[in-house]
């Protein structure tokens, strides 16, 4: 039976959102919602869509995992030589989007992306499981590879080079980024597609302007 995509719809009605109900800090409001998503058992609650733009102005997006909120900025880790790494090198502005369907909520965040310190990258890398560390050496992320067997061969090579229980150094091409927010939108699903949308817009690195926008 063929599904008519135009007929697929869901009515949202479980919650509401108003400016009088939110916290003064968008980061603290985000922490509140994230904790509620975790408590609700949201699947991959820390998963976020990261959107970047390359030097030709072409956008790309992919799912990455939030690994921390440090000094009000959002931290993730990746291969610096990946497509996203190249995009960030040429255009440091990006956007994040978290979607928690269990709570009928999403959060959109815009800001500037910079690398975290090598020390912070080392600390996180050293906390990873052994096979994840090996994987960082094996994968030339976003580059063409001839076969799965080629990847498996590289796994064996690096497992022999860095046996389990030994120190696996962090590759220089692998590390963290942090997105410093300048804009947040908190979205709460409501009936008849008249959703609640509350914005925090940073003014001059000092003050957050808070207002409602139309659905």
UniProtKB/Swiss-Prot annotation:
Which pathway does the protein contribute to?
Cofactor metabolism; pyridoxal 5'-phosphate salvage; pyridoxal 5'-phosphate from pyridoxamine 5'-phosphate: step 1/1; Cofactor metabolism; pyridoxal 5'-phosphate salvage; pyridoxal 5'-phosphate from pyridoxine 5'-phosphate: step 1/1
Q: What is its EC number?
A: 1.4.3.5
Instruction: Identify which cofactors the protein needs according to its UniProt entry.
Output: FMN
Q: What keywords tag this UniProt record?
A: Flavoprotein, FMN, Oxidoreductase, Pyridoxine biosynthesis
Is this entry keyworded Oxidoreductase? yes
Q: Where does substrate bind?
A: 9-12, 67, 124, 128, 132, 193-195
Catalytic activity annotation: pyridoxamine 5'-phosphate + O2 + H2O = pyridoxal 5'-phosphate + H2O2 + NH4(+); pyridoxine 5'-phosphate + O2 = pyridoxal 5'-phosphate + H2O2
**Residues that coordinate or bind FMN:** 62-67, 77-78, 84, 106, 141-142, 187, 197
Keyword Oxidoreductase among UniProt keywords: yes
InterPro entries recorded: Pyridox_Oxase (IPR000659), Pyridox_Oxase_CS (IPR019740), Pyridox_Oxase_N (IPR011576), Pyridoxamine_oxidase_dimer_C (IPR019576), Split_barrel_FMN-bd (IPR012349)
Superkingdom assignment: Bacteria
| NCBIfam families membership | pdxH, PRK05679.1
Q: How does it assemble?
A: Homodimer.
Could you tell me what this protein does?
Answer: Catalyzes the oxidation of either pyridoxine 5'-phosphate (PNP) or pyridoxamine 5'-phosphate (PMP) into pyridoxal 5'-phosphate (PLP).
PANTHER family per UniProt: PYRIDOXINE-5'-PHOSPHATE OXIDASE, PYRIDOXINE-5-PHOSPHATE OXIDASE
Q: What is this protein called?
A: Pyridoxine/pyridoxamine 5'-phosphate oxidase
